[in-house]
Design a protein with these regions (language model features):
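Short amphipathic alpha-helical segments, especially helix-boundary/capping motifs
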Residues: 33-38, 67-73, 141-145, 206-210, ...
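Structured C-terminal cap/extension of enzyme domains
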Residues: 255-379
Length: 379
């Protein structure tokens, strides 16, 4: 099968991988951060509350759960803080938990301070109150928690001790151990200097001290710094029983596979896009079939590096584009009109790399939709 691109013809080479439900649990905890499907017929201004297609949004979560993944709900991949406001995020969490039924325990939801504009934060007490408001709301629904980084905390904190103070007070209210999230500035520039410094070793030590002081309330930490060395260094320093969840969408296969000193679990946005292949790879890893694991994962890395390439915060556009190509939604419209945040050559390369990674589940449909994308660009 061929498609004509502006730079020439491209012949598809990938054999679509059939998605199969795992027959046994993975030997790693694996969360997929899931995207939200916009309602293209909703009368929503891009600067206001988003219009969500709840049916398709929930169906995609079922797709991910069926492939063996937990769901990281209402996180960055869902455009949290970049189009998805807190009231809509809470409704998403409620509906997702209800829809999952007996599998609701596999859903961990983002708790942050995004309803408090950073410019309106005056003290760390303001930040603690904001965290508590969201924490209590999610726990009231019976939800487990991922404690997200706070733009407001960056604004008001004067020292690493302020971070330790805030996290200790918030974690004290957690009903179950939470997953912490250290999101790097490449994902959100407003988080530059998190933990009170731009020096990584110092920031890491502050985070480790906070975790050690509150480890009864901490299941693990996800770090999204796109640096394998930093993740491994911190992983080896974590207190016993506290998990490292890789958030590294550039280096995840090796970090998950691990070494003689340990391995990372996973909480990744790229799993939204590569779920069928990643699920098969986790099954192979669980069986000790390392050659198969590497053969499946390796072709997904160039795709992930492209999708998450700078400016990284716009990676959601590539994630949703693939969901559209694969027929999980009928349109390529995003909340906050984020479908416009990448250029045509990016989409062409995403198409090619997805094909090469066996991720176009219906090549004929994918080609048809890629042609539609080309047409609206005048190609």
């Amino acid at each position: 099968m061929r498609i004509k691109f502006p730079a020439g013809n491209y012949s598809l080479v990938g054999e679509p991988l059939t998605a199969e439900k795992p027959k046994a649990p993975f030997n790693r905890v694996a969360f997929a951060a899931a995207h939200v499907v916009a309602d293209p017929f909703g009368n929503a201004d891009p600067t206001g509350a988003p219009a969500v297609d709840w049916q398709r949004t929930l169906a995609y979560r079922t797709h991910l759960l069926d492939l063996g993944f937990g769901i990281a709900e209402a996180m960055d991949t869902s455009q949290r803080g970049m189009g998805l406001d807190w009231p809509t995020a809470l409704e998403l969490i409620r509906q997702s938990l209800d829809h999952a039924g007996s599998r609701a325990g596999q859903i961990y939801s983002g708790v942050g301070t995004d309803h408090l504009a950073a410019a309106d934060a005056r003290s760390i007490d303001d930040v603690v109150r904001a965290y508590h408001e969201q924490l209590h709301a999610v726990q009231k629904l019976g939800g487990r928690v991922i404690l997200m980084a706070s733009r407001a905390l960056v604004r008001v904190a004067n020292s690493p001790a302020d971070y330790e103070n805030v996290y200790a007070r918030v974690l004290a209210e957690a009903e179950h151990p939470v997953v912490l999230h250290w999101l790097g500035e490449m994902f959100d520039p407003a988080l530059k200097g998190y933990w009170g410094t731009e020096n990584f070793p110092s920031a890491m030590e502050t985070a480790l001290q906070m975790i050690d002081a509150n480890k009864a309330h901490v299941d693990g930490i996800k770090i999204s710094l796109l640096d394998a060395h930093k993740e491994i260094l911190m992983r080896r320093k974590l207190p016993g029983g506290v998990k490292m969840y890789t958030g590294d969408d550039f280096n995840y296969p090796d970090l998950i596979a691990g070494d003689h000193l340990g391995y990372s679990h996973a909480l990744l946005g790229i799993f939204d896009a590569i779920a069928p292949v990643a699920s098969a790879a986790f099954t192979a890893l669980s069986r000790g079939e390392m050659n198969k694991y590497n053969a499946l994962m390796a072709p997904t890395v160039p795709l992930s590096r492209l999708i998450f390439g700078a400016p990284t915060q716009f990676y959601k556009t590539g994630i949703v584009f693939l969901a559209w190509l694969n027929g999980h939604q009928d349109h390529f419209i995003m909340i906050n009109s984020a479908q416009a945040l990448r250029p045509l050559p990016y989409f062409i390369e995403v198409f090619k790399l997805a094909d090469q990674a066996q991720l176009l589940r219906d090549p004929e449909l994918a080609v048809l939709r890629m042609k539609q994308m080309l047409a609206i660009h005048g190609a």
